[in-house]
UniProtKB/Swiss-Prot annotation:
One of its GO terms (biological process) is L-proline biosynthetic process. It is an enzyme of class 2 (transferase). This is Glutamate 5-kinase. Residues 275-355 form the PUA domain. Transmembrane segments: none annotated. Pathway: Amino-acid biosynthesis; L-proline biosynthesis; L-glutamate 5-semialdehyde from L-glutamate: step 1/2. It comes from Streptococcus pneumoniae (strain 70585). ATP binds at residues 9, 168-169, 210-216. Its main location: cytoplasm. Catalyzes the transfer of a phosphate group to glutamate to form L-glutamate 5-phosphate. InterPro entries: AceGlu_kinase-like_sf (IPR036393), Asp/Glu/Uridylate_kinase (IPR001048), G5K_ProB (IPR041739), Glu/AcGlu_kinase (IPR001057), Glu_5kinase (IPR011529), Glu_5kinase/COase_Synthase (IPR005715), Glutamate_5-kinase_CS (IPR019797), PUA (IPR002478).
C-alpha cells in the first residue's frame, strides 16, 4: 500500500450539528471509516477537534461559549465525552484507541518531544489508534499550538507519516472563494507552497472552527517540508477518509519534499527558540546557504545575545541583513566574544548537522498575513 501510516485531522465543522453540538452520527461515520482502514492494515492517528462542542451542553450552556474560561471548562467536560464516543465505536470493531493531549511545549522541549514520539510509536506498533487534541482545558497562550491543523502537521512530521489528510467543509484549495466566485477553480496538485498559494488560501477558508484554509496551507508547509504529503478534501462524503487513502477522493494534493527534514532538523526549523543572533560575512553566508558547510569562527562578524553553549541562535548575512537559518552553538557568548576579540579565532561555531537553512517556504510560516 502507498500510504501505510496516515494522520487524519477532523475539524469542528465536520463533527457538529447546526446548533454547534456534537453530532454522534458524524463521529460514528468517522470511526467506521477508521475501522475499515485499520482492518486493511493502515496505521492511523486521528487529530480531532470537538471537545468544546461535546461539553458545553452538559454544563448548561445554551450555545457554544465565547469566554475563554467557559470554553476551557466545556473542553474539560467534552474531551472525555468525545473520547468515549470514539472509544465505544472503535471497540465494537475490537480496536483500541488512546487519548493524547498535547501543547506546544511538547514540541519545543526536546525531552518531551522525544517522549511523545516514543509513546506514539509504541501505540502505532501495537495496533492502537491515537486520538489527539490540544490540551485546551489548561493550556495558556504561550504554550498553545493554536489550532489542530498545525497540531496535525506537527504530529505527522513527528511520526514520519506517509500522508496527512485534512477533512473539512471545503473540498480543497481554490483560486478564489468558491462560495462567492463562480470562476474559482480547485487546484488538484500543488508542487510548491509560495506566496501566491498563501494569497489564494486567504480567500477560500472555512468559517467554522478556528482553522480556515490559511492555517491548513501553513500547516501543510510543516508537513511537506518534513517529507509528508498533504491532502485537503471534503468531509461531507460518507467515504471521504477511505477515498483519500486510496487517492480517489476529489481534493487538493500537496507534494512532499523528496528529502524531508529529519527529526533534528524539524525541531530546529519549527520549534527551537533562538537565544541570540550572529552576523557573518559573505563567504560564510555562501558556505552555509549554498554549500551545506559548517559555520567557522573566521566567518563571524558580530554576535549579540546572552546565549550559552548548546543554545540555538539565528544567523544573518551581515551584507544583506537576510536571515540565513538557525543552529546550535559550540561556544557561549562570552567565550565567543573573547575569541573574536583576539582576531585568531579558529574552529567551528555551528556544525552543519546542527544547522537548518530557512527556505522561502519555511520563512512563510513566520510571516503574518
Amino acid at each position: 500500500m502507498k500510504y501505510k501510516r496516515i494522520v487524519f485531522k477532523v475539524g469542528t465543522s465536520s463533527l457538529t450539528n447546526e446548533d454547534g453540538s456534537l453530532s454522534r452520527s458524524k463521529v460514528k461515520d468517522i470511526t467506521q471509516q477508521l475501522a475499515m482502514l485499520h482492518e486493511a492494515g493502515h496505521e492511523l492517528i486521528l487529530v480531532s477537534s470537538g471537545a468544546i462542542a461535546a461539553g458545553f451542553g452538559a454544563l448548561g450552556f445554551k450555545k457554544r461559549p465565547t469566554k475563554i474560561a467557559d470554553k476551557q471548562a466545556s473542553a474539560a467536560v467534552g474531551q472525555g465525552l468525545l473520547l468515549e464516543e470514539y472509544t465505544t465505536n472503535l471497540l465494537l470493531r475490537q480496536i483500541v484507541s488512546a487519548q493524547i493531549l498535547l501543547t506546544q511545549d511538547d514540541f519545543v522541549d526536546k525531552r518531551r518531544y522525544k517522549n511523545a514520539h516514543q509513546a506514539l510509536s509504541v501505540l502505532l506498533n501495537r495496533g492502537a489508534i491515537p486520538i489527539i487534541n490540544e490540551n485546551d482545558s489548561v493550556v495558556i497562550d504561550e504554550l498553545k499550538v493554536g489550532d489542530n491543523d498545525t497540531l496535525s502537521a506537527q504530529v505527522a512530521a513527528m511520526v514520519q507519516a506517509d500522508l496527512l489528510v485534512f477533512l473539512t467543509d471545503v473540498d480543497g484549495l481554490y483560486t478564489g472563494n468558491p462560495n462567492s466566485d463562480p470562476r474559482a477553480k480547485r487546484l488538484e496538485r500543488i508542487e510548491t507552497i509560495n506566496r501566491e498559494i498563501i494569497d489564494m488560501a486567504g480567500g477560500a477558508g472555512s468559517s467554522n472552527g478556528t482553522g480556515g484554509m490559511l492555517t491548513k496551507i501553513k500547516a501543510a508547509t510543516i508537513a511537506t517540508e518534513s517529507g509528508v504529503p498533504v491532502y485537503i478534501c471534503s468531509s461531507l462524503k460518507s467515504d471521504s477518509m477511505i477515498e483519500a487513502a486510496e487517492e480517489t477522493e476529489d481534493g487538493s494534493y500537496f507534494v512532499a519534499q523528496e528529502k524531508g527534514l529529519r527529526t533534528q532538523k524539524q525541531w530546529l526549523a519549527f520549534y527551537a527558540q533562538s537565544q541570540g543572533s550572529i552576523w557573518v560575512d559573505k563567504g560564510a553566508a555562501e558556505a552555509l546557504s549554498q554549500h551545506g558547510k559548517s559555520l567557522l569562527l573566521s566567518g563571524i562578524v558580530e554576535a549579540e545575545g546572552a546565549f550559552s553553549y548548546g543554545d540555538i541562535v539565528t544567523v544573518f548575512d551581515k551584507e544583506s541583513g537576510k536571515s540565513l537559518g538557525k543552529g546550535r552553538v559550540q561556544f557561549g557568548a562570552s567565550a565567543l566574544e573573547d575569541m573574536l576579540r583576539s582576531q585568531k579565532a579558529k574552529g567551528v561555531l555551528i556544525y552543519r548537522d546542527d544547522w537548518i537553512s530557512i527556505t522561502p517556504e519555511i520563512q512563510l510560516l513566520f510571516t503574518e498575513f
